[in-house]
Amino acid sequence: MKRLLLGLALCTTAVGVPTGAAAAASPTVRMAIVHVVQGCHVWGTDLSQPLGPTRTLAVKRGTRLQIRLNCPMSFDFAQLSGPPLALGDPRSYPGTVRTFVFARKGVYRIQATNVESSEQMGMTTIGADNVLVLTVRVS
């Protein structure tokens, strides 16, 4: 009887203690690439509020960054510096979401370059198309 109660107590304790991913759920930061008239496109909030062509974020290790393409153009992503990221296919298309996971501490620089120009897409813009650069400081 004592063994049964001890076994039941251990099982209850083991089930009640979160481990692995549940114990350390990674925060998710959401951003967008949005179309604007000046410079064609910029980084934006998850609600598509423009932030500018360059942006710096400070996040903790394990953070996931999701970037939604709310611009009608395709973009190529490239890592300029920092610990290696799993980029996969560098090209992303309108309406898709790109996810990066920052598993190691360091300073990462990611560049997003539009594949089609604003002229090719028949869009009227002011000035040259921006090349977007995102700096992510991971502590």
Regions found by a protein language model. Give the residues of each.
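Beta-strand cores of secreted/periplasmic/IMS beta-sandwich domains, seen most often
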Residues: 54-73, 77, 97-103
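Positively charged n-region of N-terminal signal peptides that target proteins for export
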Residues: 1-4
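Bacterial N-terminal signal peptides
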Residues: 7-16
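Extracellular/periplasmic metallocenter environments
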Residues: 27-36, 41-42, 91-139
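N-terminal edge beta-strand
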Residues: 26-64
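Sec/Tat signal peptide C-region and signal peptidase I cleavage site
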Residues: 19-26
